[in-house]
Swiss-Prot record:
Taxonomic source organism: Brucella melitensis biotype 1 (strain ATCC 23456 / CCUG 17765 / NCTC 10094 / 16M)
Quaternary structure note: Tetramer of two alpha and two beta subunits.
Record-level GO BP terms: phenylalanyl-tRNA aminoacylation
Gene, per the UniProt record: pheS
Binding site for Mg(2+): 269
GO cellular component labels: cytoplasm
The name this protein goes by in its record: Phenylalanine--tRNA ligase alpha subunit
Length: 369
């Protein structure tokens, strides 16, 4: 048996003896690493004569290829075995009777919990919950919200569009919950014109939105909540008070300092982004203290064009609106590191971060008590 055959036999035995990924990696480094046994054989080719190189080259390269293939096959086997073992450990016999315990009742997803917390806060301020369709028209998603033609948000790389229907109209998955604001304003304006009921609008809008984005802090489908107030006397001071009260209640702190920075949103004018004071020195963010600032939401006074297109005279009525990502503020409040985990359907994750079914958020009992 030649040296190459002995070396190959030894390496293949080591590969077969590996019982986990670390073992496979150790064999790979020992054989194919910079100073591995096969790598050292390859280095000897440089000192051989052309005739020797012609004979030994194919043999050594063949050894390298066979070792690489064996490593890949063994790694695949170990991964399949690990998955099978995990499935066996976590297997649930669905024919068994349900155990009457807290675990058998499941857990409330953090997104659902935070939506309940937010709506409980705004309901206490006199707001109603409004909802709308996930599939919208270009008009309600963009035009009625003062997005001009050619705006980047209208491009295919930002928005999920459907194929045009028989009328040539192209619908889309809404990129924000703002279309519900327009639907609501149109409804109230029609009620005012037909019935003479000129009622103020105070709504909060939780829902799913869709954009072509995916990383640790973004998801192609995410939850958003917006708020809208329209009245003859709505102003920036009202907006600031509402948002301060919300932040204090949501983060469960007695006081909070807010900082408003000028920004731009097509549907509001002026537009601002709101930062709140916090302490980020520890493993978890602490709100209401410290010297750091963290962006929490965007807001502004409803743009006159939006009011006008929704049936309101901007010379008579004013409004303010705000919006925030539900997943983002859930991560901030409860210390969740990766937004993608919200949608992985991992039972262990939901058991860790989820809430008991009877933990109904109330301002009296404490939102997350």
């Amino acid at each position: 048996m030649s040296d190459l055959e002995q070396l190959e036999r030894q390496i293949l035995e080591d590969i077969a003896a590996a019982v986990d990924e670390q073992g496979i990696e150790a064999v790979r480094v020992a054989a194919l690493g910079k100073k591995g046994t096969v790598s050292e054989k390859l280095k000897t080719l440089g000192g051989m004569s052309p005739e020797e190189r012609q004979m030994q080259g194919p043999a050594i390269n063949g050894l390298k290829n066979r070792v690489t293939e064996a490593l890949s096959e063994r790694r695949t086997e170990l991964r399949k075995a690990a998955v099978a073992a995990r499935l066996e450990r976590e297997k649930v016999d669905v024919t068994l009777p349900v155990r009457e315990s807290a675990a058998s009742r499941g857990r409330i997803h953090p997104i659902s919990q935070v939506i309940d917390e937010i709506t409980a806060i705004f309901a206490d301020m006199g707001f109603s919950i409004a909802e709308g369709p996930d599939i919208e028209t270009d008009y309600y998603n963009f035009t009625a919200l003062n997005f001009p033609e050619g705006h980047p948000a209208r491009e295919m790389h930002d928005t999920f569009f459907f194929n045009p229907d028989e009328k040539g109209e192209r619908k889309l998955l809404r990129t924000h919950t703002s279309p519900v604001q327009v639907h609501t304003m149109e409804k109230f304006a029609a009620m005012r014109d037909k019935e003479g009921r000129d009622e103020p609008i105070r709504i909060v809008i939780p829902g799913k939105t869709y954009r072509m984005d995916s990383d640790a802090t973004h998801s192609p489908m995410f939850h958003q909540v917006e708020g809208l107030v329209v009245d003859k006397s709505a102003n920036v001071a009202n907006m600031k008070w509402v948002l301060e009260e919300f932040c204090k209640a949501f983060f469960e702190v007695p006081s909070v300092k807010m900082r408003m920075r000028p920004s731009f949103f097509p549907f509001t004018e002026p537009s601002v982004e709101v930062d709140i004071q916090c302490d980020r020195s520890g493993p978890h963010v602490k709100f209401g203290e410290g010297n750091d600032w963290l962006e929490i939401l965007g807001c502004g006074m409803v743009h006159p064009n939006v009011l006008r297109m929704s049936g309101y005279d901007p010379e008579v009525y004013q409004g303010f609106a705000w919006g925030m990502g539900i997943g983002r503020i859930a991560m901030l409040k409860y210390g969740m590191p990766d937004l993608r985990a919200f949608f992985d359907a991992d039972v262990r994750w939901i058991e860790h971060y989820g809430f008991r079914p009877l933990d109904i958020p109330t301002l009296f009992g404490g939102l997350s008590a």
